[in-house]
Amino acid sequence: MKKLGLVVATALAVAAIPAHAGKVLDGIKSKGQIVCGVNTGLAGFSQADSQGNWTGLDVDVCRAIAAAVLNDANKVKWVPLTAQQRFTALQSGEIDILSRNTTWTMSRDASLGVHFTGVTYYDGQGFMAPVKMKVASTKKIAKGTTVCVQTGTTTEKNLTDFSRTNKLDLKPIVFEKQEAATGAYFSGRCALFTTDVSGLASIRSKDAKNPAEHVILPELISKEPLGPSVRRGDDEWFAIVKWVVYGLLEAEEYGLTQANADKMADSTDPVVMRLTGKSEDTGKHLGLDKEWLVRAVKAVGNYGEIFERNVGSKSPLNLPRGSNNLWNKGGLQYAPPIR
């Protein structure tokens, strides 16, 4: 009986320990900004204009975290990274978070010293071809076709697997930078270009002289769950990034938007009351205050708003929600309970 009492008392004591700031969060507060690694330029996900202003789905994730942690979505330093640079920058501490259309794989998660914090975009790899080639399906790709692809990516590995499985003997022409790969494709050096379908839509919209002259083939050849990642070794920072992402999803499900975030504090819905910090201080589990999620949503909107503005119906890409819709609308996205 005494042993049981000791176990219960110990469990209660552990549960009562408040979250404390880890080294990454301490560093962020000290320098007054989050250092976010992004793509060198991918419309809809991370792209800078001529004034150096960054926009995109991956960019908004970092802004949401900055709003939650620093009370200012603009306190972010952007570090553009190629596919080959991204993990080194994260591992070395050059950046605090990698939010750069990066696929969550077992080898990356288990052996690179990083933690993926969730899926912000469910994608899949596809092909783009000139309309004049009259290739309407991956099933019609001829043997020995040349394909432009960026090296150091899952895209390159998937292309090799697809070619071998279908006995196509495809000829990859690889480039370190995506800009070089797309330039080679549009100049006619390669017959096809391959990357994630969201990337194909972005590249066709942004870089093609006439987007109508290029078709994205309908079949997917892989699953590509894209999401942010952080260095291992700081559980507090990992939890913050993970739960801000989940919070944006939960906000969409329960109707918390950029426009009504303040007013929703008057809601009597138990879940909304928790999300807004009215009935429960969920921020204490993360080392943040109770209004962390309200600030994030006020800064960039909920997940649905972020999606539609950057890659969906309100963007030039006009991509469908598909798998990125909420679970109760036929998609794969949902958050664990925030409580």
Residue ranges and their predicted role:
Residues V35-G44, W54-V69, T103, D123-A180, ...:
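Bilobed "Venus flytrap"/periplasmic-binding protein-like clamshell domains
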Residues D60-R63, A67-V69, V131-V135, G144-T153, ...:
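Extended ligand-binding regions for polar small-molecule ligands
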Residues I17-A21:
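Sec/Tat signal peptide C-region and signal peptidase I cleavage site
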Residues V24, K29-S99, L275, S279, ...:
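Extracytoplasmic small-molecule ligand-binding "clamshell" domains
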